[in-house]
């Protein structure tokens, strides 16, 4: 019997750690909630959560030393980031008039424009909160195994990622205009939506990450 995949769930004072830990455990992972670089180094994979204000997230990461941990881990093991964790990978967020991020990926994080309109001509509400569909996935990639086109996932965000390299976009969502719902670059995978809150499809995606063999 093969051993469970060890996942370091990064704890820097932000993120719904309990929900993420419970969901990852439910799909067979051995989860350690940690900010200890030694525990992270010993893990098979890294899970990078995030909710709340970007400025607070970046400050929390720096104080806990998680920013350096992420930069080191990104080169040698699979990493999955969600929501603000995904946004933090880029260079700068528009939040608070401009907040520097980790600059692991080139690109920015602009705000949704409340003047945008949906397909019915109704102005969108900000934040984008609730269920929405994603599309444009490469279904030959194992991370999307068992996920259908137009699958529903749960979103809560006022900002969205604009990667400088469009080849990193792994899925799109539409909210007033199409935006990047997921990125994939080598061993780095990230989603704007919350898989741990997305029921069957979310658990399938987390299982795919746990099983992902690069």
Swiss-Prot record:
Protein name, as recorded: Imidazole glycerol phosphate synthase subunit HisH
Gene: hisH
GO molecular function, one term: imidazoleglycerol-phosphate synthase activity
Quaternary structure, from the entry: Heterodimer of HisH and HisF.
Catalytic reactions on record: 5-[(5-phospho-1-deoxy-D-ribulos-1-ylimino)methylamino]-1-(5-phospho-beta-D-ribosyl)imidazole-4-carboxamide + L-glutamine = D-erythro-1-(imidazol-4-yl)glycerol 3-phosphate + 5-amino-1-(5-phospho-beta-D-ribosyl)imidazole-4-carboxamide + L-glutamate + H(+); L-glutamine + H2O = L-glutamate + NH4(+)
Gene3D superfamilies in the record: 3.40.50.880
Subcellular location, record wording: Cytoplasm
Residues annotated as signal peptide: none
Top-level taxon of origin: Bacteria
Active site: 83 (nucleophile), 194, 196
Record key words, sorted: Amino-acid biosynthesis, Cytoplasm, Glutamine amidotransferase, Histidine biosynthesis, Hydrolase, Lyase
Domain Glutamine amidotransferase type-1: residue ranges: 6-214
Keyword Hydrolase: yes
Pathway as given in its UniProt record: Amino-acid biosynthesis; L-histidine biosynthesis; L-histidine from 5-phospho-alpha-D-ribose 1-diphosphate: step 5/9
């Amino acid at each position: 019997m093969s051993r469970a995949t060890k996942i370091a769930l990064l704890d820097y004072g932000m993120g719904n750690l309990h929900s993420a830990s419970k969901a990852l455990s439910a799909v067979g992972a051995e989860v350690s909630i940690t900010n200890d670089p030694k525990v992270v180094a010993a893990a098979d994979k890294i899970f990078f959560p995030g909710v709340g204000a970007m400025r607070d997230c970046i400050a929390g990461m720096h104080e806990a030393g998680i920013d350096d941990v992420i930069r080191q881990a990104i080169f040698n093991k699979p990493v999955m980031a969600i929501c603000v964790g995904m946004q933090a990978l880029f260079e700068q967020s528009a939040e608070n008039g401009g907040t520097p991020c980790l600059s692991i990926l080139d690109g920015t994080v602009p705000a949704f424009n409340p003047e945008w309109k949906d397909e019915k001509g109704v102005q969108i509400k900000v934040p984008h909160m609730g269920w929405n569909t994603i599309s444009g996935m490469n279904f030959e990639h194992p991370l999307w195994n068992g996920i259908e086109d137009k699958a529903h996932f749960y979103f809560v965000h006022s900002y969205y990622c604009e990667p400088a390299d469009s080849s990193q976009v792994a899925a799109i969502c539409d909210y007033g205009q199409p935006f990047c719902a997921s990125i994939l670059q080598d061993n780095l995978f990230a989603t704007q939506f919350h898989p741990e809150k997305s029921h069957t499809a979310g658990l399938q995606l987390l299982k795919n990450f746990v099983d992902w063999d690069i």
